[in-house]
Swiss-Prot record:
InterPro entries reported for this sequence: CID5/6/7_CUE (IPR041806), DUF1771 (IPR013899), PAM2-like_domain (IPR053242), Smr_dom (IPR002625), Smr_dom_sf (IPR036063)
Originating species: Arabidopsis thaliana (Mouse-ear cress)
Biased composition (Polar residues): 13-22, 359-371
Entry GO MF terms: mRNA binding
Tissue: Expressed in cauline leaves, stems, rosette leaves, immature siliques and primary inflorescences.
SUPFAM superfamilies (alphabetical): SMR domain-like
Motif position, PAM2-like: 21-31
Name recorded for this polypeptide: Polyadenylate-binding protein-interacting protein 7
Annotated ranges, domain Smr: 485-567
Length: 567
């Protein structure tokens, strides 16, 4: 193979030299390797021989066209037909045609393997395709049919068997023209090829939506109607436009609605009977709503049976419709878009009770006329309330806000009166001292100090009254190993003194019983100091005291409530 390569190189290099310097006998010199080809060569060897012969033939063609050679194309073809084997005889007609459209180095066969499955990709075509699909007339120039076109037919014929390769090999000059498919054809082909893949319809829809948006050319409303036959086309269109023409979001909402409707039907079909709820009319106060004419209407729980007709359409019995919370629809008019928008803010797994102007807010997000007529909705709600009351212990209620403010004002009123008198006496004493009446200034200062002592005594009594009222002796806010220390209404110095005393008592109790005690300390969030120049000082002071003085780590399960563990 090295000899072949070396033999072809001088001939190729000769084409770049001027015709006047060429050896006139160089065209008649043929290497010995080309006269007697090796019989045991592989496909790679044949390929390289083909490349060498093609380059030599090209050189001969160039010389026939120049003034240095007197051979015609026919003489060159006859010459090489006698000198080269039949299977590597070059086709001068094809190469002449290629010379008109490509340069001398555009067609390279050096790295070509005749038995490579991807060989057709190495031949660029001017028509936009790949391979010699438009030039199959190569075989007509050879008698035995063992030409290059015959060998290149294998990958071309295999394109029909491999759809992926065929689609790649038959690319058009404008590939974006064929990007849009028919969604119905795509759905039909997938269903015929894979009738059941173990996925639900909604999973298949999600797979379809995750594809490129340009691959579908179908009306979104028609697509939704085909996937959700239980809903009206008008309602689907309203939901689709209400979601900003987001098809994925619309399908997710419709899927949740369909699942909720199926769950409601299963509850109605089940033969389980519910006990009548033990509720009084006070549990269901009359709610005020506005009808279609804007006139307020009053109705209680017994009128729910009459409103059940608004959840069904008189024309289409097989459709499922929902009504929005704050409005009551007339027969046949469905506020479906509001129901879908409300779905995002509702929890389908929990039953909610809202005290607002909604006519149907006492039941959860999934309801129908059957549940209202049979009274099962209220029964389910009452059963859930009873079960929660039995399983959960009674919470510890701590009054805050106005209750604390009123108590503070009432019990601290006497101390504030003494404080005002003290300030008046101190101001008069200062004025008397400034004018030089020191005796009067001293007398007024003594009266001010007396009122200051009375103020402190009043604050002490108010502190004890406030703490005992917020933390009674037989306090109901202590259960098990949990204790509650409520410091609402106390000043910082008073709260720290009380906290130090209570923690010492609880620590002694924990050591005596050898148990861990969980202490909750209620310090508030500073609502009473809101609007003043100074922020709330009690929470910061208590936190610093626990860390620095007591050495206790605390956590804050909610704002204004600290939790420590003593053992």
């Amino acid at each position: 193979m090295s000899l072949t390569k070396k033999a072809s190189e001088p001939k190729l290099s000769g084409t770049s030299i001027k015709p006047t310097t060429l050896n006139p006998h160089a065209a008649e010199f043929v290497p010995f390797t080309l006269r007697s080809p090796s019989s045991g060569g592989t496909s790679t060897l044949d390929t390289r021989l083909l490349a060498s012969s093609s380059s030599v033939g090209k050189a001969v063609l160039d010389r026939t066209e120049s003034s240095a050679s007197h051979h015609s194309d026919e003489e060159a073809r006859q010459f090489w037909s006698h000198q080269l084997p039949d299977d590597i005889t070059p086709d001068f007609g094809l190469m002449t045609q290629d010379d008109n459209s490509y340069g001398s180095g555009s067609l390279s066969l050096a790295n070509l393997s005749l038995f490579d499955g991807n060989e057709a990709e190495k031949f660029p075509s001017a028509s936009g395709g790949y391979g010699f699909s438009d030039q199959t007339g190569l075989a007509s120039h050879n008698a035995n049919g063992n030409s290059l076109a015959d060998k290149s037919r294998y990958p071309i014929s295999s394109f029909g068997e491999d759809p992926q390769r065929q689609s790649f090999m038959q690319l058009s000059p404008k590939p974006w023209d064929k990007q849009i498919m028919n969604a119905e054809q795509l759905l039909g082909n997938d269903r015929e090829r894979n009738p059941f893949s173990g996925k639900s319809r909604h999973g298949f829809v999600n797979d379809m939506i995750t594809e490129s948006p340009g691959d579908m050319e179908v009306n979104p409303v028609d697509f939704l109607a085909s996937q959700f036959p239980g809903f009206a086309a008008e309602s689907l269109a309203e939901v689709y436009f209400a979601n900003g023409c987001d098809l994925q979001l619309t399908i997710e909402m419709l899927t949740q609605l369909e699942l909720q409707v199926d769950g409601g039907l299963n509850q109605n079909i089940s033969p389980k009977t519910y006990a009548p709820p033990s509720l009084t009319p006070m549990d269901f106060p009359a709610l005020s709503i506005s009808n279609s004419h804007g006139i307020p209407a009053q109705f209680g729980g017994d009128d729910l049976q009459q409103t059940g007709n608004h959840y069904q359409s008189p024309e289409k019995d097989n459709m499922f419709f929902f009504k929005s919370g704050p409005s009551v629809s007339q027969p046949g008019a469905i506020d479906y878009v509001s129901a879908v928008r409300k779905l995002a803010s509702q929890d389908s797994g929990m039953w909610k009770y809202e005290r607002n102007d909604s006519a149907d807010s006492s039941i959860g997000s999934s309801r129908n006329s059957g549940a209202y007529k049979s009274g099962r909705g209220r029964s389910i709600y009452s059963d859930k309330l009873q079960s929660r009351a039995q399983t959960r212990p009674a919470p510890v209620w701590v009054e805050t806000g106005d209750a604390v403010g009123n108590m503070y004002s009432e019990l601290r009123e006497e101390a504030r009166d003494y404080a005002r008198l003290r300030n008046v006496y101190f101001e008069q004493a200062r004025q008397a001292y400034l004018v030089g009446n020191k005796a009067l200034a001293k007398e007024l200062s003594v009266k001010g100090q007396l009122h200051n002592m009375q103020m402190k005594a009043a604050h002490g009594k108010a502190q004890e009254a406030i703490y005992r009222q917020r933390n009674p002796v037989g306090q109901g806010n202590s259960r098990g190993n949990e204790r509650m220390i409520d410091l609402h209404g106390l000043h910082v110095s008073e709260a720290l003194q009380v906290l130090k005393h209570e923690l010492s008592v609880l620590r002694s109790t924990a050591r005596a019983t050898q148990e861990r005690l969980q202490i909750y300390i209620c310090v508030g969030t500073g609502h009473h100091t809101r609007g003043s120049r100074t922020p709330a000082r009690l929470p910061v002071a208590v936190q610093r005291y626990l860390l620095e003085e007591e050495g206790l780590d605390y956590s804050e399960p909610q704002a204004g409530l600290l939790r420590v563990i003593i053992y």
